[in-house]
């Protein structure tokens, strides 16, 4: 936040616009179509303290102006670009166009529209909604300094075997049985920060950050599942999270359990349903919450 000393108080302030939804369609050189849908949030750090303490709005960028800018800049983008590049583009505009703005924070969530295939062929203009979401946040200072973070939200992963949980603390409150055979499911949230520290250092390759996002998603999924024919055993969500994290240079991971509880039902006459690793009750409340961050001392993304 922009910090001031006002009337003997430390005063932090910022203002912005949230949940600006924009979709952009491009016609490709090959004649097909491409679409993105973004939810944009903007925060501006600026020299507008007078609007708070002296009823003077002359230094304020109206939040409605910020909203309009999102659509105007989307219109100006004649080529397909990544969510990271659009976040940087917006932030760069605000710090360069307005002398009052000292820093801009732009965060974007991309809705996962995926091209459909019909009869094994990619459709020219047909898309379906996927699940996991690509996120990005760009923080740009007046000096051109940059902090760029990308992420994944809602990456749901499940394997029906090759998981267990044994050897944990047992006391008078423990009811959970140990097992070396269970289903493992989670919804991954991941964040990673790039090492580019200025606007002038970011790669100019088209869709560079989209390619990196797809690489990270693939490594996370491949590490979780293991080889296709044999898989890989998971002794705990914690261990699997660590193995997924250490495949990257620097990353934060959050992996709550999505529980599939064994179903055993009986009455006075005997079993109605006897569990044999086959019938489960899915539930996500309450759930375990496992998270960690890992950063190599010698490397950055």
Swiss-Prot record:
It catalyses: urate + O2 + H2O = 5-hydroxyisourate + H2O2. The active site is at 17 (charge relay system), 63 (charge relay system), 259 (charge relay system). Transmembrane segments: none annotated. The keyword Oxidoreductase applies. The keyword Oxidoreductase applies. Its main location: other. It is found in: Peroxisome. GO terms for cellular component: peroxisome. A motif (Microbody targeting signal) lies at residues 299-301. SUPFAM superfamilies: Tetrahydrobiopterin biosynthesis enzymes-like. It comes from the Eukaryota. Urate binds at residues 63-64, 165, 182, 237-238, 257. GO terms for molecular function: urate oxidase activity. InterPro entries: Uricase, Uricase_CS. Its EC number is 1.7.3.3. Pfam families: Uricase. Coiled coil: none annotated. Keywords: Nodulation, Oxidoreductase, Peroxisome, Purine metabolism. PROSITE patterns: URICASE. GO terms for biological process: nodulation; purine nucleobase catabolic process; urate catabolic process. Pathway: Purine metabolism; urate degradation; (S)-allantoin from urate: step 1/3. Belongs to the uricase family. Catalyzes the oxidation of uric acid to 5-hydroxyisourate, which is further processed to form (S)-allantoin. This is Uricase-2 isozyme 2. It comes from Canavalia lineata. The lineage of its organism: Eukaryota, Viridiplantae, Streptophyta, Embryophyta, Tracheophyta.
């Amino acid at each position: 936040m922009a910090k001031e000393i006002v009337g003997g108080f430390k005063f932090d302030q910022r203002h912005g616009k949230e949940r600006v939804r924009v979709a952009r369609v491009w016609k490709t050189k090959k004649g097909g179509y491409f679409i993105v849908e973004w939810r944009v949030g903007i925060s501006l750090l600026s020299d507008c303290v007078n609007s708070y303490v002296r009823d003077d709005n002359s230094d304020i960028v109206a939040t409605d102006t910020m909203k309009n800018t999102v659509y105007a800049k989307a219109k100006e983008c004649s080529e397909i670009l990544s969510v990271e590049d659009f976040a940087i583009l917006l932030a760069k505009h605000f710090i360069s166009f307005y002398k009052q703005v000292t820093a801009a924070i732009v965060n974007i969530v991309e809705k996962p529209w995926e091209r459909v295939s019909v009869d094994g062929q990619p459709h020219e203009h047909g898309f379906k909604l996927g699940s996991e979401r690509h996120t990005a946040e760009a923080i740009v200072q007046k000096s051109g300094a940059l902090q760029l973070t990308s992420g994944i939200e809602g990456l749901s992963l499940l394997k029906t075997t090759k998981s267990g949980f044994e050897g944990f603390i047992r006391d008078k409150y423990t009811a959970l049985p140990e097992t070396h055979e269970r289903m493992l499911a989670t919804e991954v949230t991941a964040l990673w920060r790039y090492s580019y520290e200025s606007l002038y250092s970011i790669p100019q390759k088209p869709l560079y950050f989209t390619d990196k996002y797809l690489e990270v998603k693939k490594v996370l999924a491949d590490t979780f599942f293991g080889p296709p024919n044999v898989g890989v055993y998971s002794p705990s969500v914690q261990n699997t999270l660590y193995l997924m994290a250490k495949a990257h240079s620097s990353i934060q991971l959050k992996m709550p359990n999505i529980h599939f509880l064994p179903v055993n039902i009986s009455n006075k006459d005997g079993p109605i349903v006897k569990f044999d690793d086959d019938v489960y009750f899915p539930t996500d409340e309450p759930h375990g919450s496992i998270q960690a961050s890992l950063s190599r001392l010698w490397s950055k993304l």
